[in-house]
Amino acid sequence: MADFKKTVSTLFESVDIQINGSRPFDIQVHNKLFYSRVLSGKSLGLGESYMDGWWDCEALDQFCYQMLWGRIDKQIKVKSPAFLMHVLRAYFLNAQSKKRAYIVGKEHYDTGNDLFALMLDQRMIYSCGYWKDADNLDQAQINKLDLVCRKLHLKPGMRVLEIGSGWGGFAKYAAENYGVSVHGITVSKEQMEYAQESCKGLDTSFELKDYRDLNGNYDAIVSIGMFEHVGYKNYRDYMKVARRCLDDNGLFLLHTIGRNTPSRSTDPWTNKYIFPNGMIPSPAQISKSAQGLFVIEDWHNFGQDYDPTLMAWNENFQKSYDNLKDRYDERFKRMWEYYLLMCAGTFRSRRNQLWQLVLSKKGLKGGYSYQNSHRPNS
């Protein structure tokens, strides 16, 4: 037991984190079994032990930043059999197959509209905001929605397909401010019903559908925060579907979290508790999947903006928890704050990125550009 504690203490000290130290990002350990649990389970052991109250940290976001910036993950050599099985499973199974496509909808996005309504902005946008010229979450999300509309060159009367429509925030904004018709698909029943109610009276429609079943012809396609659920085995098929549904002169905007290097597995804790079967793509994986199908017109990275987005979500969640605790117990609260704050640390450390790609079928004559600032009717 003493050896376990010494090993973990040495690892944390290598990234300037002290056990039972006095700084906000130092951790306070309450259970002596914490050390063996972390060494055997890595990220899964760290996250589950936090959920169980074995340790605390005043600034989880900065704790995560310290670990990732210092590359502590490269120093932990001990891997549990469960972790190794998780990696092997990712290699040999298609965890994002059509048969499994609705799992994340039921287990994450159907968690409860009450939780997301209190945590997110007024438009219920569950993706990175664009914080340029914004000082609050609502404005950052409006900025992001308008940025997407301008990048797609939206004009009144255009038909837009949204792959992964969430609670209908983009569809509502685009229909109200740009006069377009939006058809959205989702794998979450609660999201679909919320979007249908929210967008009543607008030229929008929503359905419960897997992206592989899509057909039709659209002037523009947008996918915001959905590609992370596709999986590397399906990236090429996803791009083929987008090409099939896009008009020859149309634009496709892909908004996704990205990682700096390719991976065929995801974080075990995140996979178990937050996004089952999720996977973050790399630049090479995206480029390869689009090769021969699309011309990449623009590639915009504003990953630094996910840090304040996640911090704002956590602030809203903490402020609202008294209204949620009858349904969500203390262990859920610790799980959720761990998810939000540790994710903030991944973006702060630049381990994760946020990309918006604009793609066309054959390249735009004269090149691609978009208006820097213009918001009609809003």
Map each language-model feature to its residues.
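A short glycine-rich, Lys/Arg-flanked "PGG" loop and its adjoining helix->strand segment in the class I
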Residues: 236-248
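Conserved class I S-adenosyl-L-methionine
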Residues: 157-164
